């Protein structure tokens, strides 16, 4: 692995994108995203990146473009392909756009991403494509007690989120982890205390709630800055226990929403009992969500925040931090909640199920990926809902319809029979069936079956074996079912042409000759699967694992093993 070469690639791409000047932070983020193991050598790697960026920035823009075009043309094509992505033209314009936008996707790594959390990721990135600018990935992990980051032997949520975003085609320009920015938050807390815009509260929780509900100030609110700074130092030194001291932001004690009144910016968490997976017990004073977000949105230059309507109160709370510091608050747009019929999108409920997070019955992105949903289908679904403020409910069938659109052209057709019975009939001549792999792409070829003359045995579905019924064996002949005895149906040739079958209304059915046993896994709700064993063409053994297929009169599937397929949808 040549770190300098990878840095050179991303420095060129970043420079070309921004008029000839690459940004060290952006290049570092790209480098770390591609080679996560370099995080342990961040200081050493940054020295390399600094030198590479300086070299790239000294080149003329045309020289940068020429090298990028010759050596990594896909980086240019990726951006062009993104800009051509269907659905972007339907996005409403954002207010107050000055040049590009700086947006962020800020997941809490207490769980992996699911279909609902894909919405802010895709919408923010879509506007990054539309206007240009930056897309920031920020892990908001400052609650090691209640929402502890998920890092176990089985799953590392930080890395799983990165993997899910890459799969979605969402590429971030910068990455931050809030638990590694604690000193920054402490510095700004100290400034607020010095300004008299915050205070350390030693009230008992029940006493504070009473005063808040009565719209009264707590006795510590008017403490002079020097007293608050001394108490703050004691908090940092560990001289208070959990619940004994908090740092509050001064807001409006008469605000109609009690939760806005002097909200908590820092609290004590005993990390000797609940250590943080990244920082252990190094810190005991932790910023709340609203404080860390306010500081980061400003320092990272975020211009627009797109997030769920449930955060509307948080926007109000954060406004006080921006006002105290005299900062401009980002434009915030709230969209409604997305509900998926037939799918649980609650992180707490999904975690409580104790099912492996990438189980194909789950609506997690890893589960959907394992099932066979393509990322383009998720983009289509999210963009079709858009950023309207009202709640939206869509059926899983909508996602399946988008998925079908994308996999239909690449899914070759095969014959498979569930609940099979043997159909026996006599042929007075050789019967030939030419079955194309895809009716719309003749160039993919066909397979040819020759049966007869004489006794012919094929397998059909039991539901098609009805005495007195004429069926059209696909691409072969029209056969009348004479009688059915257990697992064997007996028939006779009725006619040969497709036109004759259409004339008499005979259904066209799939059939299998010289079959192989096929197992189909069918999701049947969260944590539940049905296993079906049927018979399929021998050609199915030649299909590569991971490929999509369509079984005639059955649906779309993805191959998972030598003779095992996962059912997606019809």
Curated annotation (Swiss-Prot):
The keyword Aminoacyl-tRNA synthetase applies. A motif ('HIGH' region) lies at residues 107-117. It catalyses: tRNA(Glu) + L-glutamate + ATP = L-glutamyl-tRNA(Glu) + AMP + diphosphate. The keyword Cytoplasm applies. Its main location: cytoplasm. InterPro entries: Gln/Glu-tRNA_Ligase, Glu-tRNA-synth_arc/euk, Glu/Gln-tRNA-synth, Glu/Gln-tRNA-synth_Ib_cat-dom, Glu/Gln-tRNA-synth_Ib_codon-bd, Rbsml_bL25/Gln-tRNA_synth_N, Ribosomal_bL25/Gln-tRNA_synth, Rossmann-like_a/b/a_fold. Keywords: Aminoacyl-tRNA synthetase, ATP-binding, Cytoplasm, Ligase, Nucleotide-binding, Protein biosynthesis. Its EC number is 6.1.1.17. Pfam families: tRNA-synt_1c, tRNA-synt_1c_C. One of its GO terms (biological process) is glutamyl-tRNA aminoacylation. Catalyzes the attachment of glutamate to tRNA(Glu) in a two-step reaction: glutamate is first activated by ATP to form Glu-AMP and then transferred to the acceptor end of tRNA(Glu). Belongs to the class-I aminoacyl-tRNA synthetase family. Glutamate--tRNA ligase type 2 subfamily. PANTHER family: GLUTAMATE--TRNA LIGASE (PTHR43097:SF5), GLUTAMINE-TRNA LIGASE (PTHR43097). This is Glutamate--tRNA ligase. The gene is gltX.
């Amino acid at each position: 692995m040549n770190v300098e070469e990878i840095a050179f690639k991303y420095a060129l791409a970043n420079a070309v994108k921004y008029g000839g000047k690459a940004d060290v932070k952006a290049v570092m983020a790209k480098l770390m995203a591609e080679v996560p193991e370099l995080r342990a050598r961040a200081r050493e790697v940054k020295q390399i990146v600094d030198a590479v960026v300086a070299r790239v920035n000294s080149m003329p823009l045309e020289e940068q473009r020429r090298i990028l075009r010759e050596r990594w043309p896909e980086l240019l094509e990726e951006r062009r392909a993104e800009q051509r992505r269907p659905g972007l033209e339907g996005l409403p314009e954002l207010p107050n756009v000055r040049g590009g936008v700086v947006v962020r996707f800020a997941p809490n790594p207490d769980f992996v991403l699911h279909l609902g959390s894909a919405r802010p990721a895709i919408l923010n990135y879509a506007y990054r494509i539309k206007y240009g600018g930056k897309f920031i990935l920020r892990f908001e992990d400052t609650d090691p007690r209640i929402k502890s980051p998920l890092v176990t032997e089985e799953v590392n949520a930080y890395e799983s989120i990165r993997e899910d975003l890459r799969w979605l085609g969402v590429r971030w320009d910068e990455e931050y982890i809030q638990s590694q920015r604690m000193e920054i938050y402490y510095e700004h807390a100290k400034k607020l205390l010095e300004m008299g815009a915050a205070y350390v509260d030693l009230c008992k929780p029940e006493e504070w709630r009473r005063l808040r509900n009565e719209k009264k100030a707590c006795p510590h609110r008017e403490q002079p800055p020097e007293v608050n700074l001394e108490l703050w130092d004691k908090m940092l030194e560990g001289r208070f226990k959990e619940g004994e001291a908090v740092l509050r932001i001064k807001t409006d004690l008469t605000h109609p929403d009690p939760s806005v009144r002097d909200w908590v910016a820092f609290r004590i968490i005993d990390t000797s009992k609940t250590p943080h997976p990244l920082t252990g017990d190094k810190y005991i004073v932790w910023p709340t969500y609203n404080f860390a977000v306010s500081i980061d949105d400003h320092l990272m230059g975020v211009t627009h925040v797109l997030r769920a309507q449930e955060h509307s109160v948080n926007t109000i709370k954060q406004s006080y931090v921006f006002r105290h510091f005299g900062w401009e608050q980002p434009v915030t747009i709230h969209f409604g909640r997305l509900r998926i019929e037939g799918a649980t999108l609650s992180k707490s409920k999904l975690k409580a199920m104790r099912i492996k997070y990438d189980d194909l019955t789950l609506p997690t992105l890893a589960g959907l990926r394992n099932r066979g949903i393509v990322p383009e289908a998720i983009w289509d679904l999210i963009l079709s809902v858009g950023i309207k403020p009202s709640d939206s409910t869509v059926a899983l069938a909508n996602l399946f319809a988008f998925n079908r659109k994308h996999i239909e052209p690449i899914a070759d057709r095969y014959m498979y029979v569930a609940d099979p019975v043997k159909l026996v009939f006599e042929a007075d001549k050789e019967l030939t069936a030419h079955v194309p792999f895809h009716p719309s792409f003749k160039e993919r070829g066909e397979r040819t079956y020759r049966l007869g003359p004489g006794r012919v045995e094929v397998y059909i579905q039991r539901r098609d074996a009805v005495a007195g019924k004429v069926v059209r064996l696909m691409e072969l002949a029209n056969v009348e079912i004479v009688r059915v005895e257990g697992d064997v149906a007996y028939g006779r040739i009725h006619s040969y042409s497709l036109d004759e079958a259409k004339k008499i209304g005979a259904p066209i059915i799939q059939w299998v000759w010289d079959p192989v046993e096929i197992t189909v896994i069918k999701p049947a709700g969260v944590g539940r699967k049905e296993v079906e064993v049927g018979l399929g063409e021998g050609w199915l053994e030649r299909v590569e694992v991971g490929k999509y297929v369509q079984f005639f009169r059955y649906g779309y599937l993805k191959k998972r093993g030598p003779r095992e397929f996962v059912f997606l949808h019809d």
